[in-house]
């Protein structure tokens, strides 16, 4: 909680029982590639200054990104969400991708995109 990760944060292929990253600030690239989250995952009000990648990760319980801010490209491609997933009030300054991801429970995607239509890739 309330932690700042200066430079890059590399959690590739890690395992978390409960991931408590509330109010965390990632000043460099945040890599959670192929990471398993077995318990509650909290990223409320977290700030990702640059790229964030959660590709091929598995969230076995609830994951909450309420009011998180993503300033760089973000990927959840090929991830599995087994619990309730909440992205309520998140802000995205760049592209966010959930390509080939699977959601098995109720999902709240009240996302605010700050990308103009001309910047989006269709």
Question: Can you annotate each of these PLM segments?
Answer:
Residues 1-122:
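N-terminal leader/targeting and pre-domain segments
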């Amino acid at each position: 909680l309330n932690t700042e990760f200066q430079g890059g944060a590399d959690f590739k292929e890690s395992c978390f029982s409960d991931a408590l990253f509330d109010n965390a600030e990632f000043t460099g690239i945040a890599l959670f590639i192929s990471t398993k989250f077995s318990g509650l995952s909290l990223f409320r009000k977290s700030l990702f200054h640059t790229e964030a990648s959660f590709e091929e990760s598995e969230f076995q319980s609830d994951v909450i990104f309420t009011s998180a801010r993503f300033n760089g490209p973000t990927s959840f491609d090929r991830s599995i969400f087994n619990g309730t997933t909440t992205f309520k009030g998140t802000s995205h300054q760049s592209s966010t991708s959930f390509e080939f991801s699977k959601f098995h429970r109720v999902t709240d995607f009240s996302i605010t995109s700050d990308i103009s239509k001309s910047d989006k890739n269709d």
